[in-house]
C-alpha cells in the first residue's frame, strides 16, 4: 500500500514522502496513529494544501522536544528492584519502569518513547535512549538497585559484585583471625 507520511518515521522516510509499506503496517499502525494517509489523488491534494501547516506544527513540536531534551539528556534515575545476591533481577526493568522513573522526576516521558537495546535483567547502571521526537533523542541512565543506599554506592562507581567480593573477603579474614586465636589458645594450654 502506498502512503503519504505526515511526519518523519524511523527507517521509513521523511514527512511528505510517498512510500510503499505492507498493508497491515499501514492499517494497524501508520493510519490509526495519524502518521500517514493513503496515497490517492484527493489525499495528495489535501496534503499539499496542509503541508506548510504540518511543517510548522512539526517544527514547533521539535523545538519543545529539544527544550525537554536539553534538561533530560544525561540524567540518572534510580529504579529499585528485588534481586539475587549475584545481582540478577527477579523479572526485568521495562520501558514502563524507565518512563515512570522519569515522570516521577518531573519529566513527561511516555513508555513508547523509551528504547531499550536489550532487556535489563541485572543490577547496575544502564544507558537507555529516549526518543522525544522523531528527530530528537537523548540518553539517560537507569541506576537499578535493591535499595536507595545501594543506588548511591553504584552511582559513586562501585558495582554490586565488587561490594559482595569485599564483604566476602572481610568475612574470610575474620574467620582466619578467629582460627588463629583458637589455635594460639590451644597451644597455651
Curated annotation (Swiss-Prot):
SUPFAM superfamilies: L9 N-domain-like, Ribosomal protein L9 C-domain
Pfam short name (any one): Ribosomal_L9_C
Gene Ontology cellular-component annotations: ribonucleoprotein complex; ribosome
Gene Ontology terms, MF aspect: rRNA binding; structural constituent of ribosome
Protein biosynthesis is among the record's keywords: no
Top-rank lineage group of the source organism: Bacteria
Biological-process GO terms, alphabetical: translation
Keywords: Ribonucleoprotein, Ribosomal protein, RNA-binding, rRNA-binding
Function, as annotated: Binds to the 23S rRNA.
HAMAP family: Ribosomal_bL9
Similarity-based family: Belongs to the bacterial ribosomal protein bL9 family.
Protein name as annotated: Large ribosomal subunit protein bL9
Organism field: Cereibacter sphaeroides (strain ATCC 17025 / ATH 2.4.3) (Rhodobacter sphaeroides)
